[in-house]
A protein has these predicted regions:
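Juxtamembrane amphipathic/hinge helix adjacent to a transmembrane helix
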Residues: 270-291
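Short, non-ligating residues that shape and space the ligands of small metal-coordination modules
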Residues: 33-34, 51-52
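N-terminal cysteine/histidine-rich coordination modules
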Residues: 1-14, 32
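Residues immediately within or flanking Cys/His clusters that coordinate Zn2+
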Residues: 17-21, 39
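Charged, low-complexity helical/coil segments in non-catalytic cytosolic or luminal regions
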Residues: 16, 58-271, 290-297, 305, ...
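Catalytic micro-motifs at enzyme active sites that drive phosphoryl/nucleotidyl and oxygen chemistry
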Residues: 10-11, 30, 97-102
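Short cysteine-rich clusters marking metal-coordination/redox-active sites
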Residues: 24-27, 42-45
Length: 359
């Protein structure tokens, strides 16, 4: 068994900085956090407490990283744009407060190297042109127009392949597709060699999709690249029904880190909502909810105003017996009561519909 001290030393050697493995008691997500970081709150859910996790830590090293290009100051500007149009915001859904709570974090991808050796068969498609004539009746006469059509000639091909591929990108988190859908794609071509100097107290998500589980995705990538290489070797323009029987050897798994900010706010019911920000392009991913309580208070206020106008209208109507000019005030009060009464439920309805659109 590896002791916690030895594991801590191994992590420090692997990552070039002092790190400690932790996991969240609430969301069960595992992280590597800087040894000097005193926060006990989970950077993933902001609800759970972090506890040390001295074992079951992946030892695949970091190889590449995409650096942060969005500063915390720019994050606040992105938040200001993000919350525009929300009329009734919860107290904590404030750009300044959200930006002050941001944590730097990195999410992992697998980089897979390996050698593929085997045999393949496929239908290779070759473009060729067919010339024909097309008759058209124009301006009282028949005209002939030449038409060139591109068609595909399919040929069965077989062969062998022996290739080595490097840095095939494979998800390392079970929720990777969900995260990228919300955060937007990263420009992986801007990745640089891993440097602990660029981490700056950032937490690191521990892969939840282990190499054994991620292998089918990696194998698919190997096969895709093999199909492209076989297509190029056959000088074909198209490939279909590609089947390969191969051995996948000399595999090496490392990590590519993607930058992300995390923050959170509590809604009026005390529920914590985590907000994620793409550290490269500033895309914001999370729920922005309106305060239904504030909306209901405004609706009740408008309803009370409408009722008050109606009461004044009645009083003015009674007063017309003594002062006819009060009839005009009575009519005005009734019209105001009607207009305000119609608009009274609008704030509550808007907040309800807005929150439904965030699901």
């Amino acid at each position: 068994m590896i002791s916690a001290t030895n594991e801590h030393q191994e992590l420090s050697t692997l990552w070039g900085q002092s790190l400690q493995p932790v996991h969240c008691l609430n969301c069960k997500v595992a992280h590597l956090i800087p040894g000097n970081l005193e926060s006990t709150h989970c950077p993933a859910c902001f609800s759970g407490r972090l506890e040390r996790q001295p074992s079951v830590i992946r030892r695949e090293p970091p190889e590449l990283m995409v650096n942060f290009t969005i500063s915390p100051e720019q994050v606040e500007m992105h938040f200001k744009d993000w919350v525009k149009g929300i009329w009734f915001r919860p107290k904590e859904l404030d750009p300044n407060l959200l930006s002050r709570r941001v944590n730097r974090a990195f999410i992992p991808l697998w980089l897979v190297d390996g050698k593929i050796t085997g045999t393949w068969q496929a239908q290779m498609g070759y473009d060729y042109e067919v010339a024909s004539s097309q008759e058209a009746y124009q301006n009282g006469t028949w005209r002939t127009r030449k038409v060139t059509e591109t068609r595909i000639r399919w040929e069965a091909r077989t062969g062998t392949i022996e290739r080595r591929y490097q840095n095939l990108v494979v998800p390392a988190l079970e929720e990777h597709a969900w995260l990228i859908t919300g955060l937007g794609k990263y420009k992986l071509n801007l990745a640089t060699s891993y440097s602990p100097l660029q981490m700056d107290n950032a937490s690191i998500r521990v892969p939840s999709l282990l190499p054994e589980s991620a292998w089918p995705l990696a194998k698919s990538k190997f096969d895709q690249y093999s199909a492209k290489d076989c297509q190029m070797a056959a000088e074909a323009q198209h490939v279909d029904e590609f089947i390969i029987q191969a051995a996948y050897e000399d595999q090496n798994w490392t990590q590519l880190l993607l930058p992300m900010y995390t923050t959170a706010y509590r809604d009026e019911d005390g529920i914590v909502h985590t907000i994620l920000i793409n550290g490269q392009n500033g895309n914001i991913f999370g729920k922005k909810l309106a305060s239904q309580r504030k909306a209901r208070i405004l609706s009740l206020g408008l309803l009370g105003t409408a009722l008050l106008c109606f009461i004044f209208g009645l009083l003015f109507a009674v007063g017309t017996k003594f002062l006819p000019i009060l009839g005009l005030l009575s009519l005005t009060s009734f019209i105001l009561a009607l207009l305000v009464g119609i608009s009274a439920p609008m704030p509550a309805i808007w907040a309800w519909n807005f929150n439904r659109s965030q699901d």
